[in-house]
Amino acid sequence: MYHSPYPTPLVPSDVSVSQFLLSSNPDDVPPDQKILSDFDNQQQTLTLQELRFNAARDASTFISRFGLQEGDVVCIFGPNSISWVALAHAILWAGGCFCGINFMATAYELTHYFTVAQPSIIAVDDELLPKALEALKQLKLRTTPRLLVVGDESNARKQEDYPRFPLDFRSSKESPIQPFDLSRRDNRKIPAGMCFSSGTSGKPKGVVFSHHNLIAYLLTLRVTNPFTHNAYMREAFFPSFAHIYGIVSGVLLPAWVGNHVQPMRKFEYLPYLRRCSELKATVLRLVPAAAVRMVKDTAIRDLDLSSVHTVMCSGAPLSDATVKGLKRLLGPETNVLNGYGMSEATITLLRHTRNGQKGSSVGKPAAGVTVCVVDDHFNDVPIGIEGECLVKGPTVFMEYKNNQTETASAFRDGWLCTGDVVKVDEDGYFWLTGRKKELIKYKGNQIAPVELEAILLSHPLVMDAGERARSYREEDTPD
């Protein structure tokens, strides 16, 4: 059993996420601190105080005009945007449960997501409305969800048949309300957010996070790596808000520590790096393919990235050669951090810190996290021997939405079974070496083989289907 070397954060169990964010200000940032600016229109901004006020007023509108009740699911289907952030906070403030859906999802995939989530409201980007409508035509949900079209005034097409966000909400005369109150309840049992993950196998499942989970994640980040997660952090942000990594780092963290984030609708390599240079970003977030390209790309040598002190890579471990290449490019003091996690553990299993790096290791357990490494019979394995990674901690998810069987099978004696194979060295550093689970990782995205097989087998001329691995050295995929 391996415990975190960092202090265990004290996670409150009697506040909602909104109450926590309203009452805690670790870097004492002023209310007028600009925390969000749009990637495509930098004049569109949001301060800490504006985010809170809008959440309080929009929550009132959700309750009075849309009938949103505690625990109701609101799906957000759209790319990263300031409106996405504002929606999530309004839903939390009202006591609802927001559910992110990847904006690249097809109508076929949406039918599955909507069936699992059973939303009372679907907030959809105006450009994606036809796709959402197509999916809803194919479904027979218990109740028909109300549609809310998301689009800022500068780019939203007017949809006469549906209310719009934020336009119609901003014109509302609703008075702000107090945040969802959990002062006399156990926040470990109250859902706050949801995203989709394939888990260890099968089709994507709705991973439900409690208010306790999300608060614990924020505290874990801060305690484990305060050098990076603070008010002085600046970044252009492309990881999808529909995934837990994007939810916490891009949606919740700025509302807590007051760091500056520019949401990027869709990742584009050169525009991302150019904006990081212009913004004087302190952090780069990369997947292995982008990291490898940076090391080899002579076209970016003229960009000033001297403000970057940390590179965070997730999706798969970086090779030692890529880590060294990034340090040559950005400076020898740059922290290149391999992160590891899964949606069900809120991505805080193992973290490097500024002063604790070891090649392509994924680090040590984050604050408050305990890890076991076991063989196929769930016996502990010795140091240096591969085994499955099992996890305990306050960031471990609440449940799979409406799926008690899969929820139960994800645990063994209270430990979350990750399905990932790791080994630990004599210094307590973890190394990710493989996967037991049936899951393909492509550029940071999860793809379940069973989904690919189902699509292939739907063709009348296909009798059977399977997959095999293929290595791409230019994307740093393993042999």
What are the functions of these language-model segments?
Residues M1-R65, E70, I76, H89, ...:
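N-lobe entry segment of adenylate-forming
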